[in-house]
């Protein structure tokens, strides 16, 4: 199960209408995942913290967040969600395709803001706390969308689109930055690496293969990964596999051996040992505790 498969699972559980690309998911750390590993996708994401405390990382910058905080994830931005000091955090995950707001015939709303925002030519703040300027206006747009999604009356999709335009108006009129401080080249390399892991973690992966995917030597790749991720590639891959295994233990009836093989471990003893070292319990105990 990779990140995309997990999101699809959540969507099915939440009975999302696939015909309208605006998905609202209620999530919990660590109930759904002990962490959401660093990843990216083409949709925009809003992480709306409901209660608790945690960390959200956006393009390598980590933010400590708590109840009522709003985090904006632009299409293509690297992001992850983690626990803070073993505390739980409940949050709303809103994922939507910005393309549904783009006109077929270009106008100034798309050429002056939406497309430059999507391409990274301009930026907006990633995090809005209750004391941030314009927080109330931004949260009001999201709250209004949440409220109408409870009943979904005829035309609710038009209402949501209207609120999204209002949301982007606030960002464009009051929160935009013309210069993009992101180190795009470094981020693009890491996006390739993370997508490679997400696609291939269930198979044997060598450092040579991943280094080749970004045209690095093995030594340069290992140094680059450690500098940007704060851990070695081998340790990161092991933790990623264990995170996916923990979710499968909860949502599937597969045997522990099958799960170990599905997430890339070719030896059950090694899997059990690594899992207990990371989570403090065996896979069987973990499944019982979370059932």
Where are these regions (language model features)?
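A hydrophobic/aromatic-rich effector-binding and dimerization subdomain
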Residues: 2-23, 78, 82-147
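Conserved short histidine dyad/triad with adjacent acidic residue
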Residues: 24-40
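Short, conserved beta-strand element in jelly-roll/cupin
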Residues: 39-56, 72
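Regular secondary-structure segments
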Residues: 50, 122, 139-150, 194, ...
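Short acidic-glycine-tyrosine-enriched beta hairpin
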Residues: 60-75
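Terminal helix-turn-helix DNA-binding modules in bacterial transcription factors
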Residues: 191-199, 204-217, 223-272, 288-291
